[in-house]
């Protein structure tokens, strides 16, 4: 019996078979999950950086951030004096007038001083502002200490209200021991009021109490 003639194998024609998609889909899912995790970590780090930055500035006086204390220093004031100038600014969108009652005073290092700012709301409605602050030279930030300040809280003013606000502060005696401050003769305390757009409804705060007698 004669075998059937063998024909040469013809090359395959048409579109090759599509490989299975499951492995690629799984890889895409893993990549997407990894990217999502990285984004979440970056967002979380950004939010965590804000309170850390604020704490760092308060702890070190970085960028002219002042310190906060509840009581006056226990040591007696030094003989050395320094001039403290007072600056005031209003951010756009806040219809207030804001200015210091004194533009400059001289204080002894370690002496507690009280100064006053006045603010007037020119709007026809109650408005709320929050004051940001710093001191220059920036090296002074870790020594300039506030005991009381209107900048600690938001300020809500009734239409047309004028308010007197106090700042109680001292320059820490350790300021004089820092060689970086040997040439510092003047410190500038600067405030800028910014509008608070989403302030919670609350009664308009009472005016500052009458100032105590005596000079600064």
Swiss-Prot record:
The keyword Membrane applies. GO terms for biological process: respiratory chain complex IV assembly. Residues 1-23 have a biased composition (Low complexity). GO terms for cellular component: plasma membrane. Residues 1-24 are annotated as: Disordered. Residues 1-26 are cytoplasmic. It comes from the Bacteria. Keywords: Cell inner membrane, Cell membrane, Copper, Membrane, Signal-anchor, Transmembrane, Transmembrane helix. GO terms for molecular function: copper ion binding. Residues 50-216 are periplasmic. It is a single-pass type II membrane protein. The chain crosses the membrane at residues 27-49. It is found in: Cell inner membrane. Pfam families: CtaG_Cox11 (PF04442). Exerts its effect at some terminal stage of cytochrome c oxidase synthesis, probably by being involved in the insertion of the copper B into subunit I. Belongs to the COX11/CtaG family. HAMAP family: CtaG (MF_00155). This is Cytochrome c oxidase assembly protein CtaG. It comes from Nitrobacter hamburgensis (strain DSM 10229 / NCIMB 13809 / X14). The lineage of its organism: Bacteria, Pseudomonadati, Pseudomonadota, Alphaproteobacteria, Hyphomicrobiales. The gene is ctaG1.
């Amino acid at each position: 019996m004669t075998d059937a003639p063998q024909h040469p194998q013809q090359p395959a024609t048409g579109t090759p078979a599509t490989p299975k998609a499951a492995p690629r889909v799984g890889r895409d899912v893993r990549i997407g999950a990894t990217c999502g995790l990285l984004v979440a970590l970056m967002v979380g780090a950004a939010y965590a950086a804000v309170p850390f930055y604020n704490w760092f500035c308060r702890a070190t006086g970085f960028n002219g951030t002042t310190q906060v204390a509840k009581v006056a220093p226990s040591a007696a004031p030094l003989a050395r004096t320094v001039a403290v100038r007072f600056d005031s600014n209003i951010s756009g969108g806040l219809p207030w007038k804001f200015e210091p009652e004194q533009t400059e005073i001289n204080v002894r290092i370690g002496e507690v001083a009280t100064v006053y700012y006045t603010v007037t709301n020119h709007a026809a409605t109650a408005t709320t502002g929050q004051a940001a602050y710093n001191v220059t030279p920036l090296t002074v930030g870790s020594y300039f200490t506030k005991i009381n300040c209107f900048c600690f809280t938001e300020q809500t003013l009734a239409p047309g209200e004028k308010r007197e606000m106090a700042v109680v502060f001292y320059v820490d005696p350790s300021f004089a021991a820092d060689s970086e401050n040997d040439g510092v003769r003047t410190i500038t305390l600067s405030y800028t009021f910014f509008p608070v757009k989403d302030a919670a409804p609350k009664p308009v705060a009472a005016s500052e109490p009458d100032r105590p007698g005596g000079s600064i």
